[in-house]
């Protein structure tokens, strides 16, 4: 560690000790002597050396008066959806986003076998689903909404002309495990148990086969595309994370075996700025990787008490990682400290979870969502305080194996072992 880093770390420790001292002083000042003494004992602060003081209250009051002056400007997406999840600034945030329990099924599409993969485009206008039958469907969101709403003829006169499924793609030999839309081009990328990653140009109506194939040595389980669209982070049934250069098809891995996971990988996600990406594994760990050097920079060990970690997802601002595990618990981790800030509990209380399932935020990051396997219902929590929200019956006749929320609208899709994918939407909201 550099000398500057050591000095900064010492300053942080001093500031934290001062913060605890101010809290204890404030508790004494407000008449909460017992609480003050208990906190002093926990943080090993000599209670007798702390005098009652209202200083903390005054500092907070001054800080709140000037807080808006230091907030960063919002980008275009944040102006539309709100700033997203940021526990540093928010105390009582207001949201216009609908509770997940208010969503309704707008369309159902069927495959010939279990459905276990889905993805939205960045603008939320298209969604793709993938199945164990090795087929992929691309569906138009406006057309799905028009099919389920008699009044939609006026709102979407062009949408009702055609069928919601605008493309069906066949070029894999085994289960489709993951799907990603390219952020800039009309390209859909698919991963499969046949060890291949394929790229489809869906701008051509006649194209059913891939124009490019990357062949791995192991079954592909998950992938995440770099925001630039130039690179692909890929996980397989093995413990080693791959980074593919899409144009050259070159594959890169971390050269240090001790930094790798020790079990099969289950999930990977880039942060929005692509400086880092996160992986989940059956070894029970979550790892954070440098997006340039491919080195592991952080490990969250046994995040779900040793249970398999099923999914990872970054918040929009990159400060937090949302993880889900086979223990049916969803957790919010602070990247800067490596601490679990919030545990979202209550799913899996009826029966033990057997299959991997993904947790997700809604489009505004006001809610955390996770499927309860035993009841085939959707559990939802307030993202900031883990308060339980109403359940939503998902209407599937088998486990929900994958879910993905639209990045910009109140819509999500559920994929189930009952061969179906359900498109959910909440109408008449901002």
Q: Residue spans of the language-model regions?
A:
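Alpha-helical interaction elements in eukaryotic regulators
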Residues: 15-23, 28-35, 39-43, 52-56, ...
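Per-blade loop-tip surfaces of WD-repeat and WD-like beta-propellers in eukaryotic adaptors/scaffolds
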Residues: 94-103, 138-166, 173, 185, ...
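Loop/turn segments within WD40 beta-propeller blades
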Residues: 118-124, 179-185, 223-230, 235, ...
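Blade-level signature of beta-propeller repeat domains, shared across WD40, Kelch, NHL, RCC1
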Residues: 401-430
